[in-house]
């Protein structure tokens, strides 16, 4: 929070909203991009980014997936939210990341675009959490794994 002693104005440094997509390929793998830019250049990241003014979280995620990997996805299912910090140009921004799960509709045009060095399909169990760019994403991976494991247990009953 920033305070102006002259006029008593308070500026609350509230979180901005980010989105990330657990995009599946139909055989259980997740879509990951290797970041081409800082912060966390070279680390794995889910397709996603910041919500623009006037967008819903769902609209932002669909836009980011198109911009980053040229992919359309089916219906989005909310997974979880996680607090995060984004360090950029000397400033640490508080972020609230919203994570969704969706299936890829057609992967024929899939390729790395804006800010993405390369794309990879990786099974959730094969992920090295230390290779993932942001703490919020690592925590969301755990939620995804636990949710899928719980779903598998209930389907077998």
Residues covered by each model-derived region:
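Acidic, metal-coordinating catalytic segment for phosphate/diphosphate chemistry
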Residues: 1-21
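A generic structural micro-feature
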Residues: 13-15, 43, 90-96, 113-116
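NUDIX/MutT-family hydrolases
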Residues: 110-141
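Charged phosphate-binding loop/patch that engages nucleotide di/tri-phosphates or the phosphate backbone
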Residues: 137-157
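Active-site-adjacent beta-strand/loop module that shapes the phosphate/pyrophosphate-binding cleft
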Residues: 80-108
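A short coil-to-beta-strand element that immediately follows conserved catalytic motifs
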Residues: 72-81
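Conserved Nudix-box catalytic region and its N-terminal flanking loop in Nudix hydrolases
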Residues: 25-67
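Conserved hydrophobic "DFG−1" position in protein kinase catalytic cores
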Residues: 23-24, 32, 102, 121
